[in-house]
């Protein structure tokens, strides 16, 4: 630890400033590096991309490659599939996990501790362990090759329940007690107290859910056999066999932009929600 007196010394201030700048620069390179390389690869001719892959910027940017990737790889069609799959997964997971966390944190049933432990126990199970059982269940319910096969399993997400429960645990119990004295039941507590106060955690959970659903690869590939209904994460590797390298990278860039823009648009709410989640409970 550095005392306030030492912080006022010129040498210490220079060292601290240099260290902070170096750390910030490193984080910036690690975070933006892959995105910038994707932009560079998308605008580079295929021959230049192969001969000089570490070049910082193409000698003659080929902006037409983005349009070619959009039309040849049918990026718009597969992006629409991805939006539908991610949106449905987000809605199902938000409703199911919100209700589950509300019941465990606010209603607190008699077997609440046991149920909470059972939910957390699923965090230790790799997804590959339950893949076969999940697929057989989808077949039994005749949901294979439909979007419901992706939407419904998204509701069973223990980590989302954990995040929401921790947030709800931080709401003062006195609010619930006062509302119950006024005759409020479980649904009134939910609609008038819990839901209005949950905007920060809803923003965080929405981001995590959408990002996870957007990049999901294995389960959509297994559950949906129709190639026309595949999301962009499944379609791009298949289409890469028939397209040039720069066209594939341009498709990757176009697929990357929607979640990046969503994060930029809702960054304020997401950062605030992460802070609340880490402090409360």
Over which residues does each language-model region extend?
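A structural signal for multi-pass alpha-helical bundles of membrane permease subunits
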Residues: 2, 8-11, 16-281
């Amino acid at each position: 630890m550095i005392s306030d007196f030492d912080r006022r010394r010129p040498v210490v201030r220079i060292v601290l400033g240099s260290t902070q700048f170096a750390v910030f620069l490193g984080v910036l390179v690690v975070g933006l590096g892959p995105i910038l390389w994707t932009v560079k690869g998308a605008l580079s001719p295929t021959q230049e991309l192969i001969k000089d892959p570490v070049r910082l910027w193409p000698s003659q940017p080929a902006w037409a490659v983005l349009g070619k990737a959009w039309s040849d790889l049918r990026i718009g069609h597969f992006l629409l599939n991805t939006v539908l799959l991610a949106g449905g997964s987000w809605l199902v997971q938000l409703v199911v996990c919100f209700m589950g966390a509300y019941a465990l944190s606010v209603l607190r049933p008699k077997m609440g501790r046991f149920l909470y432990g059972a939910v957390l126990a699923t965090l230790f199970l790799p997804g590959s362990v339950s893949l076969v059982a999940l697929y057989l269940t989808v077949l039994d319910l005749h949901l294979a090759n439909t979007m419901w096969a992706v939407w419904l399993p998204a509701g069973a997400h223990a980590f989302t329940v954990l995040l929401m429960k921790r947030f709800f645990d931080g709401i003062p119990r006195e609010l619930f007690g006062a509302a119950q004295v006024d005759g409020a039941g479980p649904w009134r507590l939910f609609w008038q107290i819990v839901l209005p106060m949950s905007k920060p955690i809803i923003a965080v959970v929405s981001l995590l859910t959408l990002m996870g659903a957007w990049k999901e690869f294995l389960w959509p590939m297994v559950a949906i056999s129709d190639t026309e209904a595949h999301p962009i994460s499944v379609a791009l590797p298949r289409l890469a066999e028939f397209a040039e390298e720069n066209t594939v990278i341009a498709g990757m860039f176009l697929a990357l932009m929607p979640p990046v823009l969503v994060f930029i648009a809702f960054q304020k709410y997401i950062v605030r929600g992460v802070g609340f989640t880490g402090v409360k409970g």
